[in-house]
Amino acid sequence: MEIKEEGASEEGQHFLPAAQASDPGDCQFTSIQKTPNEPQLEFILACKDLVAPVRDRKLNTLVQISVIHPVEQSLTRYSSTEIVEGTRDPLFLTGVTFPSEYPIYEETKIKLTVYDVKDKSHDTVRTSVLPEHKDPPPEVGRSFLGYASFKVGELLKSKEQLLALSLRTSDGGKVVGTIEVSVVKMGEIEDGEADHITTDVRGQKCALVCECTAPESVSSKGEKTLEFVPVNLHLQRMQVHSPHLKDALYDVITVGAPAAHFQGFKNGGLRKLLHRFETERRNTGYQFIYYSPENTAKAKEVLSNINQLQPLVATHADLLLNSASQHSPDSLKNSLKMLSEKTELFVHAFKDQLVRSALLALYTARPGGVLKKPPSPKSSTEESSPQEQPPLMRRQDSIPHHSDYDEEEWDRVWANVGKSLNCIIAMVDKLIERDGGSEGSGSNNDGEKEPSLADSIPSHPREDWYEQLYPLILTLKDCMGEVVNRAKQSLTFVLLQELAYSLPQCLMLTLRRDIVFSQALAGLVCGFIIKLQTSLYDPGFLQQLHTVGLIVQYEGLLSTYSDEIGMLEDMAVGISDLKKVAFKIIEAKSNDVLPVVTGRREHYVVEVKLPARMFESLPLQIKEGQLLHVYPVLFNVGINEQQTLAERFGDVSLQESINQENFELLQEYYKIFMEKMPPDYISHFQEQNDLKALLENLHQNIQSKKRKNVEIMWLAATICRKLNGIRFTCCKSAKDRTSMSVTLEQCSILRDEHQLHKDFFIRALDCMRREGCRIENVLKNIKCRKYAFNMLQLMAFPKYYRPPEGTYGKADT
């Protein structure tokens, strides 16, 4: 940005009010020289170390920007930032821009007033003129924190065009924080200045990405604004080089337990809350009709099928009419075949007993609709039988009322769709048979099924095909519309029952589940992409990926005591919900390779983008868009002093049930793996791995109910690695206990797979814990190189989970 001294020049005068510009005695002002159509000045704001007026209050900060013109000496409110909630160090995304036509000079003074907003409904941007140095009157719903002011020239001439100003109270005495003003730099590139532009931009972009996408730190896990973000998510990679053995790569992802830390665990976690919610719904049936989660899911499935199949049937019916108008027998037969297939699927979708029972429940729930006994079928309808010829269904109330309701009415309405289709088939057969004898032989089979329908259709000339099929198609559509109308109302009634009991409680549970799932999903996507890239040229892995799917194993170190019970309950549900996730690999069409998540709560698809060169190396099934499934399992063993209390005086049944349930899931995955993978691959796989024995050993350890049986985790991790799975290790913060477990796992791999001598095992273990990425992870989170353990705690830890002397002490956790 160039600063230019001007007197009475044209460029300077257009910034002055007209009355002042005509005064020859007017003083000179320095205008800001900018390219036309560019803003004269842009800057961004950030506050640091703000002092709250009330102790322990979380600030909701807003900055009001006002301008003091050098000529008029009046204070004009110009704009304001957005509100940044819950922090003493807000960074505002809304900058301040002065357009090219705005009268601003180096001598122009800008005043920044910081407020704590208590009621957002009163926060509006206003423009008004006040005498200089007069503070605006206090706004309703906000309290004054402090102010600072500067001249535009001071900002532009400062080092790096950055000012750090002290915020002071209205009397100018007490300092209540700092506000930073930074110019947004948009300069021009001259010859010779662009040599390193690519390197600089990439470096800045990487720095921004690292800063903005960094995982939530341990100290922030209780903040509401970060509750959907995984805690301390990191990739731990060990690459082993050996002169005698093949090089190997081992990845473990470490992350804090996916849980609703902000909401807390006073009433337990999701597993307990969901069970209690279902029990209360079941036992409060007088307020609503109870439907199990399975029935609710079935209702959603049927509604989804309806929405997909109805337009398909209508489309194929129109295609049939189009073929009839063209008098094309082959096209007519093909269109009829497609119509028949889609209509049969449509009819099959309503065979479930849930639709019938929902119709009855909806009728009974209506005022005055208490069903005492089913009405006689004879009095239920006076319409002609659809067996003679499907009539055009007359529009009526989709669910008949008290006096004329018939439980068998649904069967008749539903069956009319099939009968209408049979009439269409019979008519098409008759038309084709009359058009050519040989072409009709294949359709006589259908005619034998419904001889009365075929024989009852009179002969018609060839040119009347469209006119003869049109009424039958219209009847089919009307019958379908009647079925869809009734089914949608009844199944929607089923879904509404889910919310009939304690709607706020249901919404809070849904929110909690979404929070936990979001954290788990972020880690899963990270793990999947890393595993895909490291195994991209492994044909066995790629075949397993699209044939069977991937096992995703979570190792939990949470205790079954106090708040960590709730964390474990949240974590168990969140990881189980990952079964709803499928992956789809697509070719990247641009440099944007960030994954994209689509779908709803019942089913998510994550699209992973690969560059063209990498995408071409994939098997055909994956390139064609086949969905790739994951099988998440969780094994948890508490290892700290709280687990000692739980084992001696509390309850460990939660941990036992989780381990048993997930062992069964792991066993089921192994069974599918052995059935679906090719025999030659299986024979080679079995020579290298004895998974059956490992699974039996794992089952025995789960059944043994041994205290702090960490062998469960060792066996589960080994099985996961041998099945080409993705590994996660979790504790409350993924910082202390997780560090002990991951380093132990790495040393065990070196010993078992890469011939690390047993005499060096402990030395290598201590070295990994004293130096390297684990202690750096601790430093990054709490600014201290100390694991948050004390001597008494470590006495309760299993032997190999204790850090070396000098690496632990009093620290944040």
Curated annotation (Swiss-Prot):
Signal peptide: none
UniProt biased composition (Basic and acidic residues): 1-13, 394-404
GO molecular function, one term: inositol-3,4-bisphosphate 4-phosphatase activity
InterPro entries: C2_dom, C2_domain_sf, INPP4
Keyword set includes Ligase: no
UniProt name for this protein: Type II inositol 3,4-bisphosphate 4-phosphatase
Low complexity: compositionally biased ranges: 378-391
Record's keyword terms, sorted: Hydrolase, Lipid metabolism
Keyword hit for 4Fe-4S: no
Upper taxonomic lineage: Eukaryota, Metazoa, Chordata, Craniata, Vertebrata
Regulation: Strongly inhibited by inositol hexakisphosphate.
Enzyme class, UniProt record, top EC level: hydrolase
Gene behind this protein: INPP4B
Family according to the record: Belongs to the inositol 3,4-bisphosphate 4-phosphatase family.
EC annotation from Swiss-Prot or TrEMBL: 3.1.3.66
Chain segments carrying region Disordered: 1-24, 370-405, 435-460
Reaction(s) catalysed (UniProt annotation): a 1,2-diacyl-sn-glycero-3-phospho-(1D-myo-inositol-3,4-bisphosphate) + H2O = a 1,2-diacyl-sn-glycero-3-phospho-(1D-myo-inositol-3-phosphate) + phosphate; 1D-myo-inositol 1,3,4-trisphosphate + H2O = 1D-myo-inositol 1,3-bisphosphate + phosphate; 1D-myo-inositol 3,4-bisphosphate + H2O = 1D-myo-inositol 3-phosphate + phosphate
Biological or metabolic pathway of the protein: Signal transduction; phosphatidylinositol signaling pathway
Functional note: Catalyzes the hydrolysis of the 4-position phosphate of phosphatidylinositol 3,4-bisphosphate, inositol 1,3,4-trisphosphate and inositol 3,4-bisphosphate. Plays a role in the late stages of macropinocytosis by dephosphorylating phosphatidylinositol 3,4-bisphosphate in membrane ruffles. The lipid phosphatase activity is critical for tumor suppressor function. Antagonizes the PI3K-AKT/PKB signaling pathway by dephosphorylating phosphoinositides and thereby modulating cell cycle progression and cell survival.
CC per GO annotation: cytoplasm
Species this protein is from: Macaca fascicularis
Residues covered by the C2 domain: 23-165
